Amino acid sequence: MPDDSRISPLDQARILSEALPHMQRYDEETIVIKYGGHAMGSENVARQFASDIVLLEQTAINPVVVHGGGPQIAAMLQRLGIKSEFAAGLRITDAATIEIVEMVLAGSINKQLVGYINEAGGKAVGLCGKDGNMVTAAKATRMLADPDSNIEKVVDLGFVGEPEKVDLTLLNQLIGHELIPVLAPLATSKGGQTFNVNADIFAGAVAGALKAKRLLLLTDVPGVLDKSKKLIPELSISDARKLIADGTISGGMIPKVETCIYALEQGVSGVVIIDGKTPHAVLLELFTNQGTGTLIHK
C-alpha cells in the first residue's frame, strides 16, 4: 500500500467515498476473521491487522477473530525437544503436546493479539472454545492409505477434535457491545477433555453458528488458484467441488475450501480466502469494489 503522505486529499476523499456503500452493506453485521499463524509472524503485520479490526468495530461491524498458531507451536515444541508430527494436515497431539498447544494458543498468542487490539483503541476479550463451553468437540479421525499396501487405515491424531456444537451464550454477551472476541481454537469434549482444533475448521463452525455475513480465512496464498496458478476471484459451491474432483484444488487448500462449503451450508452469506500477508487485506476485501482473494458463495 502506498504511504498515506503520497496520497492527495482528493484521492483520500475518493477512497472514503468508495468505502461508504461497503460500510453500509456490513452495518451491524458479524464478520468472522480467521487470522493464520504464518501471517502473524511479523509484529508489524500483527499490529496492522489489530488496527484494521478496530476500524471494523468503529464502523458498526461486529468482528470476531479466530487465530491460529501453527508456527509458534512448532517453535515451542522444538525448543522443548518435542517432535512435531502431522497426518492429513493435522497436528498429531499427544498428552504432552496438548499442554504446550494450550499454553501457546490460549496464553501467549491470544493475549498478545488482545493486547495489540486494545493498544489500537479497541476492547478485545481473549477466549478459547473451552470458555463457557462455547465449542464442544469430538475426537477427530482421519483415514490414510498405507504407503506399502495402499490400504486405508484410521490414524490416531491424539487430542485433536472436530466441533460438534457451538454455544453462542457467551459470544452473544460480547457481540454488538463494542467488545471484540478473540478466540483460540481449543475446545472441550463432553467429558472435559481439551482438544486442539484446526483454526480454519474452528472459525467455520463459529461463523456457521453465528450465521455471519462473511467468513474471511487469512492464509499464505492469494486465494484459490487455477492450474495455471492464476487467482480465481469467485467460485460457487458446485464450482469448488468440481475443482477438488479434478485436482485443481489440492493439498492444504482442500480442507480450507471444505470449511468454506460447510460454513455456507450453515448459513454464512459468503466466505473469502485471502492472503493474510497483504497489507490491510481485510479492509481491501470488505471496503473496496475490487476486493481481494477468492469469494466462495452458494
From Swiss-Prot:
GO molecular function: acetylglutamate kinase activity; ATP binding
Record: residues binding substrate: 69-70, 91, 196
Pathway noted in the entry: Amino-acid biosynthesis; L-arginine biosynthesis; N(2)-acetyl-L-ornithine from L-glutamate: step 2/4
Covalent S-S links between cysteines: none
Gene3D superfamilies named among the record's database cross-references: Acetylglutamate kinase-like
Cellular component annotations (GO), alphabetically ordered: cytoplasm
Known EC number: 2.7.2.8
Origin superkingdom: Bacteria
Protein function: Catalyzes the ATP-dependent phosphorylation of N-acetyl-L-glutamate.
HAMAP family, per the entry: ArgB
Family listed: Belongs to the acetylglutamate kinase family. ArgB subfamily.
PANTHER family with a match to the protein in the record: N-ACETYLGLUTAMATE SYNTHASE (PTHR23342), N-ACETYLGLUTAMATE SYNTHASE, MITOCHONDRIAL (PTHR23342:SF0)
Descriptive protein name: Acetylglutamate kinase
Organism: Nitrobacter winogradskyi (strain ATCC 25391 / DSM 10237 / CIP 104748 / NCIMB 11846 / Nb-255)
